[in-house]
Amino acid sequence: MIETNVSRRHHETFIQVIQSYYQLTKPRIIPLLLITTAGSMWIAAQGQVDPVLLLVTMAGGTLAAASAQTINCIYDRDIDYEMERTRHRPMPSGKVQVRDALIFAIALAVLSFTLLTVFANLLAASLALSGIIFYVLIYTHWLKRHSTQNIVIGGAAGAIPALVGWAAVTGTLSWSAWLIFAIVFLWTPPHFWALALMIRDDYAKVGIPMLPVVEGNAATVKQIWYYTLITVAATLLLVYPLHASGIVYAAIAISLGAVFIRKSWRLLHNPEDRPTARELFLYSISYMMLLCLGMVVDSLPLTHHLVNAAINQLHLIS
């Protein structure tokens, strides 16, 4: 009986350790990064992605993102302890020690680089590694605690997965790859500033100079409005002049963009309304995921066949 209880406690402890390391990686953030990788890969491969390459690239991207987020947790453990919503994370709660977390992060980065180098190419691996370095040194260490533009410049780190996906397929970076990077980069400020409006008091408490804290809600929603307009406009450049995507993607991008603009407009006229900020924040996630899904669907040979058949049918009718 005693041995059974001891075994159960050991099992529970092991599960708790696994859960703590899993939480270090901030797993809810990673799918949003991977969907941009997928969208980029499908366009680059013209709708015919090698399943093995897709799996490897997604795995490498997951490991790279997990490494960056783990180091972010190490660096931010002091401010995480001060905020109620983050106080129970593994680092501030003492569930994981700094040394162990750092070893874990390095192991993830090495595994990501190795996997992408061996099964994709060196360019994809180097881009993933640069994403980790940029996120840790430029955003976490330098910008986050010192500049209201932390999210703007730091958004480059979150846009790098799109480049990784394109590089994994082609071994190069075209104008289309850089445009997808730019779309994610421009989308980041409206997304994160909407969140910052919701939790402004938390950031103020720990001295993080997020735009709503330093310049106020009114100035922030104006910036959100401008970036939303530019983001939506940028999404259409994949259709013209780059011709990387077609009519199906265009219809999806216009529809999603119209809703994005409407929600941003509502926030512009209700800068103090947190439910409106929350609504925009949640929609921005759906917007990016559905936009990238639109890239995938539009690139498929079946989609091209159906569109061409529909156009031919219209010509016959006319």
Curated annotation (Swiss-Prot):
GO terms for molecular function: protoheme IX farnesyltransferase activity. Pathway: Porphyrin-containing compound metabolism; heme O biosynthesis; heme O from protoheme: step 1/1. GO terms for cellular component: plasma membrane. It catalyses: heme b + (2E,6E)-farnesyl diphosphate + H2O = Fe(II)-heme o + diphosphate. Its EC number is 2.5.1.141. The keyword Plastid does not apply. It is found in: Cell inner membrane. Keywords: Cell inner membrane, Cell membrane, Heme biosynthesis, Membrane, Transferase, Transmembrane, Transmembrane helix. Disulfide bonds: none annotated. GO terms for biological process: heme O biosynthetic process. It is a multi-pass membrane protein. Carbon 2 of the heme B porphyrin ring is defined according to the Fischer nomenclature. Converts heme B (protoheme IX) to heme O by substitution of the vinyl group on carbon 2 of heme B porphyrin ring with a hydroxyethyl farnesyl side group. NCBIfam families: cyoE_ctaB (TIGR01473), PRK04375.1-2 (NF003349). Belongs to the UbiA prenyltransferase family. Protoheme IX farnesyltransferase subfamily. This is Protoheme IX farnesyltransferase. The lineage of its organism: Bacteria, Bacillati, Cyanobacteriota, Cyanophyceae, Nostocales.
